[in-house]
């Protein structure tokens, strides 16, 4: 009888220790999973609320230099800080040419044209993007696809000829 009580007690203690160890291992994993879900959900929400549209493209140039100006309307509900706008990518692609520019490249400028004077690109405001002094040999006359990609992957496309 005493043996059974001792055996049962040892099994109970072993069970409690095993359950505690399992909880200590599983709980952090569940917590990390919940954090990942929250992070993905936040990023998806930001993408859904961000929308842009290229409304006009103008190209000027001569035999040596090409300048491309385009205007982008913020049609989404996301308010974008000027630093985030400068993280955008600009692509000009044709059947023979591929050019990529970023906000840190010389000759690339961003200006909010009809804003309210703050450093945010808000719904309804128009962003003027200038890509100036492109070597004409790098960008021969052709039909190009302009792709403007924001920091979060939201993009707008338009075609232009030069």
Swiss-Prot record:
<dbReference type="GO" id="GO:0005198">
    <property type="term" value="F:structural molecule activity"/>
</dbReference>
<dbReference type="GO" id="GO:0097588">
    <property type="term" value="P:archaeal or bacterial-type flagellum-dependent cell motility"/>
</dbReference>
<keyword id="KW-0732">Signal</keyword>
<dbReference type="Pfam" id="PF01917">
    <property type="entry name" value="Arch_flagellin"/>
</dbReference>
<feature type="signal peptide">
    <location>
        <begin position="1"/>
        <end position="34"/>
    </location>
</feature>
<dbReference type="InterPro" id="IPR002774">
    <property type="entry name" value="Flagellin_arc"/>
</dbReference>
<protein>
    <recommendedName>
        <fullName>Uncharacterized protein AF_1052</fullName>
    </recommendedName>
</protein>
